[in-house]
Amino acid sequence: LLAPLATQQTNLGGGRRLIETYTMEGMLGLLWHGPSGAEDVVLCAAGGMGGYLGPADGLYTHLGETLAGASTAVVCVDYRRPSHLESSLLDLAATADRAVQQGARRFVVLGHSFGGAVAIQAGCALGPYCAGVATFATQSAGCEHAAQLAAPLLLLHGAQDRILGPENSEIVRSLAGQGEVKVFEGADHLLAEVADELRTLMATWIPERFAAHRTG
């Protein structure tokens, strides 16, 4: 999908690998927690500046440390061209394709801020392979076709978000025609104020989505 010029990876220990794919449009970085052949894969889409950590004081890497196991992988995606929606969606699609070739059967997609739109579009593109989508302080731009998302949708937002107000999550729910919105009082765009609550919520919600997809 990306016409790579070269790819290299290194083992970081603790079941983590860093994979770099070089293309004419930039470098795609993947921080891969868990086995390469996992059947259940969590794709984590960064905000508009890229990176691996996600919101809430490193939620994505925390989930990688706690959820990755024998049949589950958590992959943090650092885009080739941050803030470019079409290119970032292709980055997630290429990552999902890599996972499927290695044995993946279902996905949960997470996205923060700009990455919320990437996650929703990726969930739509994955179709029956998508077990769920969760967004954190999402933007509404780029979510115009959210009604195509068949998987469960969870939209999490800080009430004190001054970058993208919580009305953005309500707009996306309206566009999707489904989904659950949770607004956290006292939390801003990075949701650091409710980091522990989000970690606990995701530690339950993600396995539930995989289990429901597996049996349904």
For the regions a language model picked out, list residue spans one by one.
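Short, surface-exposed "cap/lid" segments of acyl-processing enzymes
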Residues: E25-M27, P35-G69, C76-D78
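N-terminal cap/lid segment of alpha/beta-hydrolase-fold proteins
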Residues: L1-G37
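Catalytic histidine neighborhood in serine/cysteine hydrolases
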Residues: S174-L190
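Short alpha-helix in the alpha/beta-hydrolase fold that links the catalytic acid
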Residues: G165-S174
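Alpha/beta-hydrolase active-site loop
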Residues: L59, S83-Q102, Q121
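Catalytic histidine-centered segment of alpha/beta-hydrolase-like enzymes
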Residues: I163, A187-R199
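Short beta-strand/loop motif that positions the catalytic acidic residue
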Residues: L149, L155-H157, D161
